A protein has these predicted regions:
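Helix-loop-helix junctions within the multi-pass membrane cores of secondary transporters/permeases
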Residues: 33-116, 170-171
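Membrane-interacting alpha-helical segments
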Residues: 29-32, 36, 40, 154, ...
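Flexible, glycine/charged-enriched surface loops at secondary-structure junctions
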Residues: 24, 61, 66, 160, ...
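Transmembrane helical segments that form the transport core of multi-pass membrane transport proteins
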Residues: 18, 23-24
């Protein structure tokens, strides 16, 4: 949760302010409907129409940019999910007494990045990816039950952050790309 807040406020707020030349307050106010929908549905794919509407109508992003960036982001921008899964793998490894070496952490990190790109933007889409990572880390199968039981709580925040990242990317692209 703390990493989500940091990423949402500091990273995306800073990108919008310094790269997108837009007030972070205006940005976060404008995207609130999409962020709340993402939080409630746990689906970045279901939030695509609302995200497009927010960035086009409230932030002045062109349809050309939002029509590419929002769906692409909903498909491959799963960085918050990747962060949550990394923390969960290390938490469960410590809780189960599984020693994860530095080299294994690097392998898990690389696999996590690849798996997060392939994670579907639907509720619970990260469960299969987590199962693969848990197996790689040598965690017992019982951790899946615990992970599935808390996944929705983590998924709500992670999906919200992913969708905010998609919209922040649109604002930055609008500033950086000349559409003449």
């Amino acid at each position: 949760a703390a990493s989500d807040v940091y990423k949402r406020q500091i990273v995306y707020g800073g990108a919008v302010k310094f790269l997108g030349k837009t007030s972070p307050f205006k940005f976060f106010r404008a995207i609130m409907p999409a962020a709340l929908n993402a939080f409630g549905t746990c689906s970045s794919s279901a939030t695509i129409p609302i995200s497009k509407s927010c960035v086009e109508n409230e932030l002045g992003v062109s349809n050309q940019i939002s029509s590419i960036a929002i769906p692409l982001g909903a498909t491959v921008n799963m960085d918050a999910v990747s962060i949550v899964m990394s923390f969960m793998i290390m938490f469960f490894a410590n809780a189960c007494g599984v020693n994860v070496s530095v080299s294994m952490m690097i392998i898990i990190l690389l696999a996590n990045v690849l798996l997060s790109v392939g994670t579907p933007g639907i509720p619970g889409g990260a469960i299969a990816s987590f199962a693969a990572l848990a197996t790689m880390a040598g965690l017992p199968a019982g951790v899946m039950g615990v992970y599935i039981s808390i996944n929705t709580l983590c998924d709500m925040g992670a999906t919200c952050v992913n969708v905010i990242g998609d919209m922040a990317g649109c604002v930055v692209l609008q500033e950086k790309i000349d559409l003449k």
